[in-house]
Regions:
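Structural signal for the C-terminal ends of transmembrane alpha-helices
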Residues: 30-32, 168-174, 211-221, 320-329
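Membrane-interface helix-loop-helix junctions at transmembrane boundaries of multi-pass membrane enzymes
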Residues: 218-230, 304, 308, 318-353
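Transmembrane-lumen/periplasm boundary regions of multi-pass, lipid-linked membrane glycan transferases
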Residues: 55-56, 237-266
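Transmembrane helix-loop junctions in multipass membrane proteins, especially transporters and channels
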Residues: 34-38, 175, 196, 215-223, ...
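Residue-level signature of transmembrane alpha-helical entry/exit and packing/kink sites
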Residues: 11-19, 106, 131, 155, ...
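Start-transfer (signal-anchor) and selected internal transmembrane alpha helices
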Residues: 1-31, 227-232, 236
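Membrane-embedded helix bundles of polyisoprenyl
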Residues: 22-25, 111-124, 128-217, 231-251
Length: 358
């Protein structure tokens, strides 16, 4: 079983080669942003950029982290409102000293996402080429490119941690070592610091389901199971603690935000499900232009969208073939079940339409 033999140590060279190859792929795809004097002009990129530039200058001049910015909505907090969090994301200590700016940081996170997919697949002893292609499929998913292009960098960078979190969870449950729990805690903490709560929530949902599958399918003694569950729970708590500087202030401010002030203590259901995917629009996974390519050409069920949710025919065919071939393995069953759960969540307000069609 692939779940039974995850190697504790792997050679560094294959991972270095994979990382270099992913970097070359990213540079080939986004060369205009890296090598040419071009930038992205999406409103979601330009609007926050203006205040970020001013806050960066204020931080540099004062030597203190700005906690208030007066330019938006007659003034609003920076940390509590998630409007200026770059300084609380620990990896930015390194990225801020590199000469390629925010776009370069996002591209490096794309490479990190691909390497995470590679590491996850190699942990199941897949061939290097197969693992590399799997990581590339995740890294080059059109959704990731759309997040980069349309100014949702935090969403992209938070999603980059998803395969790494699953990889770390597997290691904790198979090796039950403190070092693995520490690595998972760091991954979880950094992902939460990147502060796209929705993507982090999806990641934790998948991680929890995987942990449950690993506990049930392993047939270990109660003592061994409790040991692994303890390491896992500790990693989760430490991960939350790492990101506390972001979420403690935000939790105090939430009641005053637009979403938190809605009835019931959170965003109204109608508002929260405005961008639900109608079951019929799943066809765009195969034919991206079926409901238009976004913008003024879009005529689907969402209020508007800037891009189709294309997954790729080849990727989907390979995923289906892999599921059929290895459907008896716990991790494959986890992937199949989590895919169905993800679709049900995506349907949102249209779940009744899905139920009626069934």
């Amino acid at each position: 079983s692939p779940l039974g033999g995850i190697p504790a140590k792997n050679g560094v060279l294959p991972y270095a080669a994979a990382a270099a190859a992913y970097l070359l792929l990213a540079l080939a795809l986004y060369y205009q942003l890296v090598f040419l004097p071009m930038t992205l002009s999406a409103p979601d990129s330009l609007v926050p950029l203006a205040s970020s530039i001013a806050l960066d200058r204020l931080r540099e001049a004062s030597g203190q982290y700005p906690l208030w910015q007066p330019w938006t909505f007659a003034g609003m907090p920076t940390v509590e409102a998630f409007s200026y969090l770059g300084g609380l994301y620990y990896p930015n200590i390194v990225f801020s000293r590199l000469p390629f700016g925010d776009i370069g940081s996002q591209i490096l996170h794309l490479c990190f996402a691909g390497l995470g997919g590679y590491a996850l697949l190699r942990s199941f002893r897949l061939h290097h080429a197969a693992a590399f292609l799997g990581g590339a499929a995740f890294m080059l998913n059109p959704y990731m490119t759309a997040m980069l292009v349309h100014g949702h960098g935090s969403q992209l960078m938070t999603a980059a941690y998803m395969p790494w979190v699953l990889w770390g969870t597997l290691r904790v449950f198979h090796h039950a070592k403190l070092a693995d729990a520490g690595m998972l805690a760091i991954l979880l903490g950094f992902q939460l610091q990147r502060a796209h709560v929705q993507i982090a929530w999806y990641t934790w949902l998948l991680m929890g389901l995987l942990a449950l599958v690993l506990l049930v399918s392993a047939h270990r003694t109660v003592k061994e199971s409790l040991k692994r569950a303890g390491f896992f729970a500790t990693a989760c708590m430490v991960g939350i603690a790492i990101s506390a500087a972001v979420y403690l202030p935000a939790s105090e401010y939430a009641a005053y935000s637009v979403r938190g002030a809605a009835g019931g203590g959170g965003a109204a259901m109608e508002y929260a499900t405005m961008w639900s995917m109608h079951p019929v629009e799943l066809l765009t996974f195969l034919v991206p232009g079926l409901y238009g390519f976004g913008g003024v050409t879009y005529w689907g069920f969402m209020p508007f969208t800037d891009f189709p949710h294309y997954a790729g025919i080849v990727v989907l065919l390979l995923a289906f073939a892999g599921f059929v071939a290895r459907r008896s393995e716990p991790f494959v069953l986890f992937l199949g079940g989590s895919t169905l759960l993800a679709l049900l969540i995506a349907f949102g307000a249209f779940q009744s339409a899905w139920a009626d069609s069934v």
